[in-house]
């Protein structure tokens, strides 16, 4: 259970675990939005002051990477990892593995977006989307941080849907390699695609 109360809509203290394209890119976007962001790399560090934790590690080193971080105490957590290889024993999704280690309300988000495009989000006429799944207690915070990164949140369901999101990596890469290249996406209701 989370020991942290976060003021949704206000500045949050965010610890990003992983300084690669995803973690580093989101850290920059959230800093620009006014959040207090600390980025931790392979050396680990302390997350005790964080309201929210983002996990952006390679799937094979999630447990090892999180073991190097002290102060993980049930914070709201966003898991942005993707599966490459087999799932860890005992877990149906990487998000469940992350939740078992950190212990707080968890969401799966940002794993279906191309980090290479983060710096182009603001140039878009319409906000691109981000699919996410979330524990109820993490939903409002996750939606706010998705918006603060420049995307529109698209809710898929509770954290039980995380594996479905993780399975999209093959489709996402396939579409990109098929000729489209890195892309934004958006889902709309009927009538919303008409010219504005």
Regions inferred by a protein language model and the residue ranges of each:
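NAD(P)+-binding Rossmann beta1-loop-alpha1 motif at the extreme N-terminus of oxidoreductases
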Residues: 2-45
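Hydrophobic Val/Ile/Leu positions in short beta-strands of Rossmann-like dinucleotide-binding domains
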Residues: 14-16, 55, 132
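Short beta-strand and adjoining strand-loop segment in the mid-core
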Residues: 85-87, 120-138
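Rossmann-fold NAD(P)-binding glycine/threonine-rich loop
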Residues: 81-122
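Hydrophobic residues within alpha-helices
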Residues: 26-27, 98, 142
